[in-house]
Amino acid sequence: GLTMEGTAPGAAPRFVVTGEISCIYKRHGRTRKVHNLILLPSLEAAEELSVRLEAIGNIHSDGRPILGLDSRDLLELTLETCPEAEFIPAHIWTPHFAMFGAFSGFDTVEECFGDLADQIHGVETGLSSDPPMNWRVSALDRLSLLSHSDAHSPSRLGREADLLDTGLSYPELVQAIRTGEGLLGTLEFFP
C-alpha cells in the first residue's frame, strides 16, 4: 500500500485499478499457463482494455479471467490500449500458473515476453518465495520485487504488500515500480 503521510484523518480510501488475467496458450509445443497483473491509471482505461479483451474471450466468467492469449500478446495489447499501464507477471514461482512455473512457464523474462521484455519492470513474487530467494537470481536484478495479496481471495487481503515511500498518485506508484525509487521492500506472509 501507499504511505498515508499527508492524508487527513477519516479520508476516503484510495484504490489502484488492477486485474489479474490467466493466460493459457501453446508455444513451442508446450502448454503455457501464466498469470499476469495489470495496473491501470483509471476506470476509463480499464473499460477500454475490457472492451478489447472481450473480443478475445469471456472476461466476466471469473474474478481472474482465463484467456487463450500469449502473455507477450496480452502485454502488447495492454500497452497499445493504455501506454501508462504497468504489466507485472504474478506469483512468478508458482509451479502451475506462473512465468517461471516448473510445469508451465519459461526460463527467462525474455523467453516469455520476447521483444517486449524491456516493458517488464517488476515481478510479483507470491507466497512461493521470499526476498532472499529472489535476490539470488541474477536475472531478476533489473526488476522490482513486489508482493501482493489477491483480491479474488478476500479473506486473505493484506497478507502481503509492497512498502512504499511515494506520493498518493498512480504516476508515483508506477515510477516506484519502474525505478525502485520509493520502493522500500515488501511485507511477507510467513512461508
Where are these regions (language model features)?
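Extended substrate/RNA-proximal surfaces in nucleic-acid metabolism proteins
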Residues: L2-H121
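Glycine-enriched alpha-helix->loop->beta-strand junction motifs that scaffold or abut catalytic
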Residues: D118-H121, L140-L146, L163
